[in-house]
Every structure is written in C-alpha cells, then in structure tokens.
A protein has these predicted regions:
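Buried hydrophobic positions in well-ordered alpha/beta secondary-structure cores of metabolic enzymes
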Residues: 16, 42, 56-57, 87, ...
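Single conserved hydrophobic/aromatic residue that forms the stacking wall/gate
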Residues: 1-8, 12
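Amphipathic alpha-helix from the class-I
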Residues: 63, 89-107, 119-121, 125, ...
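A short glycine-threonine-serine/GTX helix/turn-capping micro-motif
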Residues: 76-87
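Active-site PLP attachment segment
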Residues: 33, 37-67, 86-93
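PLP-dependent enzyme catalytic core of the Aspartate aminotransferase-like
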Residues: 101, 111, 179, 185-207
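Conserved PLP-binding catalytic core of the aspartate aminotransferase-like
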Residues: 110-117, 126-166, 187-190
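Conserved PLP phosphate-binding loop immediately N-terminal to the Schiff-base lysine helix
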Residues: 13-34, 47
Length: 207
C-alpha cells in the first residue's frame, strides 16, 4: 500500500483533515480510524472550533520532531512561533469544542453516519440522480441527464443551485456545486432530522 511504501522509503505522509476532522467521520481525526493511514503531519481547521471561531493548525508526529531534533543541519528547526499563531480565544474555543465532542457527539456522528448514507441512497430512484456518495456525515448527490448512461447534465444549467433554491424554501441549506448537491449536516443530528433532510431533498429535486 501507499502507507507501507512511504514508510519503507522514509517518505513523510501529510493528511488534510480540514473537512474530515473533528467529528465529520465520527472521530477527532479520520486518518487512522477510517482511512487506515498514520500520517506524520495533519492539517486541520473548521471543525476544530465547529466554525464558531476561525482557527486552523497542524499536528506533527513524534517521529518527525525527533528527526528534526537529531539533525545536524544548521537550518533544522521547527518554526511554530508565528505572529498570529496561538490566539488565546481561538485555542480556548477549540479546547471547549473538543470537550463537548467527547461528551457523546462523536459517538452520535459515528452511529448515524451509516444511517445518513443509507437514507440518501433512496434518492437514486429519481430520474436525474446519477450518484449518491459519501462517508460519515458528509455526502454528495450528483445529478445526470441520463441515469442509464450517466451522462452529465449541461454544466451551464447549474442544477445544483436550482435544487438548493427549492430546498431553502423548504428549510434545508445545501452546498450547490454545478450539478451536485453537497451536504454536511450537524453532528448532533438525529434519525428524525435525517428523514426530514431526505424528504426535503426529494421534494427539491422533483420540483
């Protein structure tokens, strides 16, 4: 695998968890638990504060730090003390956010992620829905012109925006992207919420 090849070649692995981290997949980080990757560097943002305060960061493995410390190169250093880093309010928000996540929110996301994915796949019976894909509490519904041949809709139709407008009127916000509808529901979602989301999506797509 890529992971084993990287380890054998002493190549460092960097994992981007800006979207997948902090609960979206039911774990603080999805790299090891979901994707079976043990990275040397993880970049993260967004979910670390649940969006209540702008904050991003990096996590670095002990292996990488050890290699930096043992280097004889004159310029070997880990420069992490920057002018706008370690904002006290941002860090306080992140710490409290993680405390809340570890109080049942991660478990809820882990339990309901598969339910969310399964319910969304019921939309595949609609003529223009060509694909429903995702993992955990993040998903994408892709619309096509011909389900059988999976021909994409004309990009200038921006069908995702059309569906989003209908869904907004019914109480659901999507992220439209050309012919796709992207969803990242709250981590505190319940089964009734999932049913309502799928019902509104169905109505929005039909309209």
């Amino acid at each position: 695998t890529l992971s084993r090849s990287s380890a054998a070649s002493d190549v460092y692995k960097r994992q981007d968890e800006v979207v997948t981290g902090f609960g979206r997949m039911g774990h603080i980080f999805a790299s090891e638990k979901v994707f079976n990757i043990i990275p040397d560097i993880i970049t993260f943002a967004k979910g670390v504060t649940s969006g209540y305060f702008p904050l991003g960061g990096i996590a670095i493995s002990n292996k990488l730090i050890k290699n930096l410390r043992s280097s004889n190169h004159a310029d070997a250093m880990f420069g992490h003390g920057l002018t706008y880093s370690s904002h006290p309010i941002g860090c306080a928000v992140a710490i409290k956010n993680i405390e809340l996540m570890e109080n049942g929110i991660l478990e809820n996301a882990l339990e309901l992620g598969p339910v969310f994915q399964e319910k969304l796949k019921t939309l595949l019976d609609l003529p223009i829905v060509g694909d429903v894909r995702g993992q955990g509490l993040m998903a994408c519904i892709e619309c096509v012109a011909d389900y059988n041949e999976e021909n994409p809709l004309a990009l200038d139709l921006k069908v995702g925006e059309i569906i989003d407008k209908h869904c907004q009127k019914l109480g659901l916000l999507l992220r439209p992207a050309i012919n796709m509808c992207i969803l990242s529901p709250p981590l505190i979602i319940n089964k009734n919420d999932i049913d309502k989301i799928v019902s509104i999506l169905r109505q929005g797509i039909i309209q």
